[in-house]
């Protein structure tokens, strides 16, 4: 049976959304929103959307046939059947107001994802950190095994050139977003929880117990025959395990993990480890990603694939040939500066634990290099709530260029901005950070900072990613030695 024939057979088994033909996305330029929109375009729905700025997501959707408007206006929703809204959109948005007046259904992003998942074999990946990489690894393993899954990922899967794709099988692999508790809409067959930490606490009223209970509720959305795959190394996940009334598969470096990593080593961008599973022979693996945290992400993929009886040969090949995800320890090239060659890496991590894991991976893979980090804090509330943790982790690099906070729409908070954080790190005494008042100034400062052999790491979830790519394209203002292919 050809892929086309398989897809036709699959579509005959999945009911279309009754009366819904025209779907409009408010905030379509986000990775999660754009990914769902792409799947719906490919399913044959008439998709439109709006956002405040053009980006690579909107450009791709336009090429696929979606109608994209830059800017929000009431006229954008006049002829649609349903409006999908992202978390970033508030109730005063003119398109939301117009949709309410026209009695057009308004659904959250996760509700639309849940509809896509409802008649498929869903695999949902949740957790404070590692969701995007874990989802990408699972999608890659399933693809290598010939399962041809549909996937919706919060980052660019480099091998596919996109963050979403409509497959021809019954599998749907997707990130599950806990930031607004909307992952409770999902009803997958397999759920993964990578870890649980205090983040997005405004959603949970500042109550960490409520956050933990919400993760338990997410796992209980599984059917009684479903599988919960959880990281036993995480202390909070271990704590809630007795409350989970579903079949559990654990993974980690811990001796009591069902899927355990042993003999870890890292050389440059790659890791080697042995995986031990109950009832199976040990398997020696090469992972084309750096860091112990990424081995944990790979273990989650191994656990899911093993439960689904995917052949080990697909695991071995998918992990060894994994081409990475955009902005997840992404090597952008090597450049010659007046003082010598430097290496440029870009990473999305913006929580202290994520930044610490990235630093650890960089130290393990390139111990001889001086680590220069250009860090852009993301959200004033996160900077305020995790202030001391940020001071601790950012003090671990050799040279720190600290940008101001990327607000993500939040109002400034006194004492939780880049200048305050810079002062606090300096007072700690380990490091003398350089404050970068405007992103445009970063390129001006680099010539005085960079030395031969440095690893320059641009870090954060804001527009520092675009800035990093601009630095790569302009070769840091110096000469190119070796430049990786840089996706837009």
From Swiss-Prot:
Signal sequence range: none
GO cellular component, one term: cytoplasm
Pfam families: Mur_ligase, Mur_ligase_C, Mur_ligase_M
Annotated pathway: Cell wall biogenesis; peptidoglycan biosynthesis
EC number: 6.3.2.8
Binding annotation for ATP: 127-133
Subcellular localization(s) per the UniProt record: Cytoplasm
Keywords in alphabetical order: ATP-binding, Cell cycle, Cell division, Cell shape, Cell wall biogenesis/degradation, Cytoplasm, Ligase, Nucleotide-binding, Peptidoglycan synthesis
Protein name (Swiss-Prot/TrEMBL): UDP-N-acetylmuramate--L-alanine ligase
Source lineage: Bacteria, Pseudomonadati, Pseudomonadota, Gammaproteobacteria, Alteromonadales
InterPro entries referenced in this protein's UniProt entry, alphabetically: Mur-like_cat_sf (IPR036565), Mur_ligase_C (IPR004101), Mur_ligase_C_dom_sf (IPR036615), Mur_ligase_cen (IPR013221), Mur_ligase_N (IPR000713), MurCDEF_pg_biosynth (IPR050061), UDP-N-AcMur_Ala_ligase_MurC (IPR005758)
Reactions mediated catalytically: UDP-N-acetyl-alpha-D-muramate + L-alanine + ATP = UDP-N-acetyl-alpha-D-muramoyl-L-alanine + ADP + phosphate + H(+)
Source organism (scientific name): Shewanella sp. (strain W3-18-1)
Protein encoded by which gene: murC
């Amino acid at each position: 049976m050809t892929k086309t024939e398989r897809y036709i057979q699959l579509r005959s088994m999945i009911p279309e959304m009754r009366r819904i033909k025209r779907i409009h996305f408010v905030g379509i330029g986000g990775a999660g929103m754009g990914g769902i929109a792409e799947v719906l375009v490919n399913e044959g729905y008439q998709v439109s959307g709006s956002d405040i700025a053009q980006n690579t997501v909107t450009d791709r959707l336009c090429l696929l046939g979606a109608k994209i408007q830059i800017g929000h206006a009431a006229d954008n929703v006049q002829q649609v059947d349903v409006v999908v809204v992202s978390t970033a959109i508030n109730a005063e948005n003119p398109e939301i107001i117009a949709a309410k007046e026209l009695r057009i259904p308004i659904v959250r992003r996760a509700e639309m994802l849940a509809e896509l998942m409802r008649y498929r074999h869903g695999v949902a990946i949740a957790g404070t950190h590692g969701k995007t990489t874990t989802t990408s690894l699972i999608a890659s393993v399933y693809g290598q095994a010939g399962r041809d899954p549909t996937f919706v990922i919060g980052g660019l899967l480099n091998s596919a050139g996109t963050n979403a794709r409509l497959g021809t099988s019954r599998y749907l692999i997707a990130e599950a977003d806990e930031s607004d508790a909307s992952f409770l809409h999902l009803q997958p067959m397999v759920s993964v929880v990578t870890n649980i930490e205090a983040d997005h606490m405004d959603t949970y009223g500042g109550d960490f117990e409520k956050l933990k209970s919400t993760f338990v509720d997410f796992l209980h959305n599984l059917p009684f025959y479903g599988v919960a795959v959880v990281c036993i190394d995480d202390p909070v996940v271990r704590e809630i395990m007795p409350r989970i009334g579903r079949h559990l598969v654990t993974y980690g470096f811990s001796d009591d993990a069902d899927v355990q990593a042993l003999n870890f080593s890292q050389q440059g961008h790659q890791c080697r480890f042995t995986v031990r599973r109950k009832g199976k022979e040990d398997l020696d693996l090469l992972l084309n990603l750096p860091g112990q945290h990424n081995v944990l992400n790979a273990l989650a993929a191994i656990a899911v694939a093993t439960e689904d009886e995917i052949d080990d040969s697909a695991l071995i090949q998918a992990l060894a040939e994994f081409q990475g995800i955009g902005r997840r320890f992404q090597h952008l090239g090597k450049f010659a500066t007046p003082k010598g060659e430097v290496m440029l890496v870009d990473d999305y991590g913006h929580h202290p634990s994520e930044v610490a894991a990235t630093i650890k991976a960089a130290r393990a893979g390139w111990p001889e290099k001086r680590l220069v980090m250009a860090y852009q804090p993301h959200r004033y509330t996160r900077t305020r709530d995790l202030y001391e943790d940020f001071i601790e982790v950012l003090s671990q690099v050799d040279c720190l260029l600290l940008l101001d906070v990327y607000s993500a729409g939040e109002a400034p908070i006194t004492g939780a901005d880049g200048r305050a954080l810079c002062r606090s790190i300096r007072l700690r005494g380990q490091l003398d950070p350089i404050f970068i008042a405007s992103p445009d100034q970063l390129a001006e400062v680099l010539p005085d900072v960079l030395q031969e052999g440095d690893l320059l790491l641009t870090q954060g979830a804001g527009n520092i990613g675009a800035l990093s790519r601009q630095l790569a394209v302009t070769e840091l203002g110096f000469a190119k030695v070796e430049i990786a292919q840089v996706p837009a």
